[in-house]
């Protein structure tokens, strides 16, 4: 059985030269969350260690402030708050 190889991904925060991640900016955080609102690992997002840690802190703050749900039922996965308006 062969191992699945992931393509090289680059940290979008480093490339965009972002200096601060705000927990209220859900559009920026949604790229690091799965459809069930779990934090995706670095190997899938391509974030560097520094930015992955900062994103995790911002997501945890957003969850604490009730901007992002902690857990999601399978029935509620269809209704995403990140829909484009």
From Swiss-Prot:
The keyword Membrane does not apply. GO terms for cellular component: cytosolic small ribosomal subunit. GO terms for molecular function: small ribosomal subunit rRNA binding; structural constituent of ribosome. Keywords: Ribonucleoprotein, Ribosomal protein, RNA-binding, rRNA-binding. Belongs to the bacterial ribosomal protein bS18 family. Binds as a heterodimer with protein bS6 to the central domain of the 16S rRNA, where it helps stabilize the platform of the 30S subunit. This is Small ribosomal subunit protein bS18. The gene is rpsR.
């Amino acid at each position: 059985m062969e191992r699945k190889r992931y393509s090289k991904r680059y940290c979008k925060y480093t490339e965009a030269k972002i200096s601060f991640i705000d927990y209220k900016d859900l559009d920026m955080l949604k790229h690091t969350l799965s459809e069930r609102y779990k934090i995706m690992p670095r190997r899938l997002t391509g974030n560097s260690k520094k930015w992955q840690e900062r994103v995790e802190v911002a997501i945890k703050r957003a969850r604490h402030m009730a901007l992002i749900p902690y857990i999601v039922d399978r029935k509620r996965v269809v209704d995403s708050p990140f829909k484009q308006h």
